[in-house]
């Protein structure tokens, strides 16, 4: 929401990807009211479904035939229960990393088109300091092991299996960005791959974690 708001204030044409919901609709109306002179377009996308992400990729191509200047992979969930998605991956890993990876692949040609036309395009992935709680990426978290990755464990902040899974997703964000940056640099591409840690912010991320039992010891 805040990222979209900032881009709209700069006069950008913004596509906002989200699952259909009352909360999203209310946020969309606020953005439209505050930025009546700019264009904001909703695109249905559920990151817990690869099929939904692919549909969103096709929609973005329809809306941006001349290219995409910036892709901001900003969505995330934190310390949720050990459950699988419909694609059998861990719900955190698919939401936070795998679907972002897929979306990037699906719209990469649009980013290349914009970079060639305008001299630059950017891919921005949001990571977290939580990546430092894990020493290395473990393949099991990237495979179809949803529901079999340590259970729910402790609700202590940055403790237990659910927080380990979250840390793996955030390390995956950073590793993906570093690898992509390296490959783009070798090609002398005008696409920049960047990773950011947004710091602590007032969002609904923590409230969702609390409802799911992931931060009980803090409240």
What are these regions (language model features)?
Residues 210-219:
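Terminal hydrophobic/aromatic helix or amphipathic segment near a protein terminus
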Residues 1-210:
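Rossmann-fold NAD(P)H-dependent dehydrogenase/reductase core
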